[in-house]
Amino acid sequence: MDNFKNSSSISKIIKNASHPIFSEEGLKTYKKNKNFESALFQIFNETKKFVAVTMGSRGVYWVENNSLYHCKVPKVKTVETNCAGDVFHGAFASALSQHKSNSESILFAAATATLKCMKSGGIYSIPKMSIVNKFIKKLKITKIKW
């Protein structure tokens, strides 16, 4: 969720979304520049559901079941980041629609978006499933003590 105006609609969207996922800038704007961990837990405590933030090359952080998790992505040569967020959200939704767990969906989305950033060309830079499935093995999920 990119929320650069901090509109009141964002609270309604969060309430109604099954899996709200923010961009780093969107989360900072929405929660008035709190550190991302505190912001995620505040939203989780308000909604009692999964909430995440994408942080580019620093990966993805999320809270579910009152625990903080991190999906670390490998360092890659970035060529183009345009639409990386859209690719992430689309891949995440696709994985959820296939009844994947939240963690599996994060892995799939992070791998897909990371690979997309390694090429230019809009829709033509979205990687093939076989490439994503190999690349997923390079990603790591960690439960963070908080």
Regions found by a protein language model. Give the residues of each.
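Conserved beta-alpha-beta core of the PfkB/ribokinase-like small-molecule kinase fold
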Residues: 1-41, 59
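Conserved phosphate-binding/catalytic region of the ribokinase-like
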Residues: 36-146
